[in-house]
A protein has these predicted regions:
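Extended, folded cores of ATP/NTP-driven motor/assembly subunits in large transport
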Residues: 1-390
Length: 390
């Protein structure tokens, strides 16, 4: 039994709690109203090519198409011996073969320059009440010089995004969670770690690209009061896709996307390293779509058939001209051997074909700055017999 004093105290606490709750709700409603007022234009928001980003990290890209992302750590491939490199490559091939033709996987490698002042604040040695502050100042000076002259201040991040078709969100969640578990296991076997991203983290990544230098202040509860979507919090102030030929602007940033057009039969594993050594804001996107095994087999057999016909034509020409019919153009012989090897791998080892698109997006404050970055990207490609085009 409560005394009157205790009951009065309890009622006072309830009243105080109720007032605080109402005040908080009023504040959130006012904030939501302000967010609606400050939101980017609808046209700008609609330029972001996805439908919804859910709090658990599931993204609805298009009707019936869903994706999830994981952050991956570096794999010590370059410094490994050949046997270990071969083992990593085999496990990577197994990882890719784990996707079917209803899936798409994208590997993103992001170069982002840190603000030097912020970088020094985070890493410099702070003064302490001892006799070593002069040494700390000297170390900070050396660190700053290295940051300004090298790529120490570059933040390099790597992500894997995988996409699947599904009838609804729940089915997508079930299948993508299974895929996610396989991805995490695969990268663990390669000596890496894979950390699933929630919705907020994926929005923060998009925000860093679309609004460089800004900090995303966002909570999913905000959407209840503003009536907006996640598009409103990451969209830049504007998009201009008519800025210049092959270029567009996002807010105050000028951007351009290049694609890998020509490349040798085998691309050096140093290409990505050279690209990420460029001191600039860059994003590499490698989009990988598995081709249905039956369709892939027919494609290779058809290609092989065309080359065999070409071989027969070349032999017939040689015989008419009095040459040895077994002497064929080197590239034709090599292509036939490759087609035969590929067919054998597909039949015996269940290997599959992939449709791959290699993209690089560069950003700069001005067209002149972007020109310099684009030239560095193209130069990196030329060093490996690759051509990047607009």
């Amino acid at each position: 039994m409560f005394t009157r004093t205790e009951e009065r105290s309890k009622n006072t606490k309830k009243t105080g709690h109720s007032k605080a709750l109402k005040l908080l709700q009023r504040h959130k409603k006012e904030r939501g109203k302000q967010e609606r007022k400050n939101a980017p234009s609808r046209a700008t928001q609609d330029s972001l090519a996805y439908r919804a980003m859910y709090e658990d990290g599931l993204c609805e890209v298009a009707p019936g198409v869903f994706s999830k992302s994981v952050a991956i750590s570096d794999i010590n491939y370059q410094i490994s011996d050949r046997d270990h490199q071969s083992d990593i490559f085999s496990k990577y091939a197994e990882f890719l073969n784990g996707f079917d033709s209803e899936s798409t996987v994208q590997i993103n490698i992001i170069n982002r320059r840190k603000d030097i002042r912020q970088f020094m604040q985070e890493t410099s040695f702070k003064h302490r009440p001892d006799d070593l502050n002069a040494l700390r100042d000297e170390m900070n000076h050396i660190m700053r010089e290295r940051v300004e002259s090298g790529n120490t201040s570059l933040l390099k991040e790597k992500y894997v995004t995988f996409t699947q078709h599904a009838d609804d969100r729940q089915r997508a969640k079930t299948s993508l969670n299974q895929l996610q578990a396989n991805v995490v296991t695969s990268f663990h076997q390669m000596g890496s770690t894979a950390r699933p991203l929630n919705g907020l983290r994926r929005l923060q990544l998009a925000n860093a690209t679309l609004r460089p230098g800004s900090v995303l202040h966002f909570d999913y509860d905000d959407l209840k009061y503003s009536g907006l979507t996640t598009h409103s919090v990451i969209a830049p102030t504007s998009f201009n896709f008519k800025h210049a030929k092959n270029r567009f602007t996002m807010g105050d940033q000028v951007a351009q996307v290049l694609y890998l057009r020509d490349y040798p039969p085998e691309i050096s594993d140093r290409l990505i390293t050279d690209l990420t050594d460029i001191m600039a804001d860059l994003e590499i996107a490698i989009q990988i779509h598995p081709i249905d095994p039956v369709k892939g087999m027919k494609m290779v057999q058809t290609k092989k058939g065309f080359m065999q016909k070409q071989k027969a034509d070349e032999q017939q020409k040689a015989m008419k001209a009095g040459y040895d019919p077994d002497i064929l153009p080197e590239n034709l012989t090599h292509s036939l051997d490759e087609a035969e090897d590929l067919l054998q791998q597909m039949q015996d080892d269940n290997q599959q074909l992939f449709d791959v698109t290699f993209l690089v997006m560069a950003q700069g404050k001005t067209d002149q700055q972007l020109d310099e970055i684009i030239e560095q990207v193209k130069a990196a490609g030329r060093r490996h017999s690759c051509e990047f085009a607009n």
